[in-house]
Amino acid sequence: MTNFQRIGSISNAHIGRDFEVIAYAHFIDLGYDIIKDVGLSVGHERKKNHRFDLGTPLNAEEKIIIECKSHRWTRPSDNVPSAKLTVWNETMNYFHLAPEGYRKILFVLRDFSVKRNETLGEYYIRTYGHLIPKDVEIMEYDEVNQSVRVL
């Protein structure tokens, strides 16, 4: 059986939670009132609750929802992690269906491919840009420099 867990990690769930902590700290440092696990009713005519990784409390004046993705190029060949990018596409759909008035942020890990000469976030925008709602911001976290840039 092949193990698709990231090398050096306890589990992929731990990786995701650790990355959410980084995103949470980033937005708190910027002065935003951010909480974890924000539930919103999403959908067209029929609605269903969806839990976003981070966001502002429901009664906040400035409304923000954030989804965090710490995916990397598939190792060792820097192949496209196609299955993982379908999760990014699903996130775009949830952002599209979210209530109006929310600032929508996809917070991703910067992973640069020398083979492709671009980050996974840049690749996603280039390849799937037609699926990204115009009001979604994609922010890329560089774990080496501990910095964030808007793509």
Regions found by a protein language model. Name each.
Residues 52-70:
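Active-site beta-strand-loop-beta-strand hairpin of nuclease catalytic cores
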Residues 14, 18, 22, 49, ...:
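Short, well-structured alpha-helical interface segments that form or flank functional binding sites
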Residues 38-40, 107-112, 140-144:
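Acidic carboxylate-rich catalytic motifs and surrounding loops in phosphoryl-/glycosyl-chemistry enzymes
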Residues 68-127:
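Catalytic cores of nucleic-acid endonucleases
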Residues 30, 57, 97-101, 131:
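Alpha-helix C-cap/termination motif
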Residues 14, 18, 103, 123-151:
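Charged, structured surface patches that assemble and position nucleic-acid processing machinery
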Residues 1-42:
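Acidic-basic catalytic patches of nuclease active cores, encompassing PD-(D/E)XK
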Residues 38-56:
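N-terminal interaction modules that seed assembly of large macromolecular complexes
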